[in-house]
Amino acid sequence: MTVTVNGLDQLKKLAGSDLGSSDWIEVTQDRIDTFADATGDHQWIHVDPDLAAAGPFGAPIAHGYLTLSLFIPLFTELLDVQGVSTKVNYGLNKVRFPSPVKVGSRIRLVARLVEVEDVAGGAQIVVDGTIEIEGGTKPAAVLQSLSRFYA
């Protein structure tokens, strides 16, 4: 369920709130191949299903940075900040990839809005995010995201 706020004052009131979980999305071989083409990372563990099946993970796996890049579309399912002119990614802290995402797996984001602080012309949010793998015992990614919203 999406939490919608209008303006920075309403956003500030959400500090410390759990934002819940996104819907599950499937990580397909096509998505992995497209990411490989975009980044030039064609390592066999990602793009060669036959070799990867015999490799350490038993199947192709998503690039860690592909998993990380999915934070944004998953996060937009959780928080919609309206009444601002600009929304930008500011950075990341503490990114880890505890478990690989095998092709065909489904992932989702669980997020908490840790902090909202004033910055010149707007506000910066700090979000703790965990990208879970359906049926997995360890998350695919654990991160802290920084975003800015300008009035």
Tell where the protein language model's regions lie, with residue ranges.
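HotDog/MaoC-like acyl-thioester-processing domains
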Residues: 1-14, 100-151
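Catalytic strand-loop segment that frames the active site of acyl-thioester-processing enzymes
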Residues: 2-62
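A generic structural signal for short beta-strands and their flanking turns/coil linkers
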Residues: 21-23, 31, 41, 84-93, ...
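Generic structural detector for well-ordered beta-strands
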Residues: 24-26, 96, 146-148
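Internal, well-ordered alpha-helical scaffold/interface segments
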Residues: 33, 69-73
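Hydrophobic beta-strand-centered segment that forms part of the acyl-chain substrate-binding groove
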Residues: 55-59, 72-110
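A solvent-exposed, acidic/Ser-Thr-rich amphipathic alpha-helical stretch
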Residues: 65-67
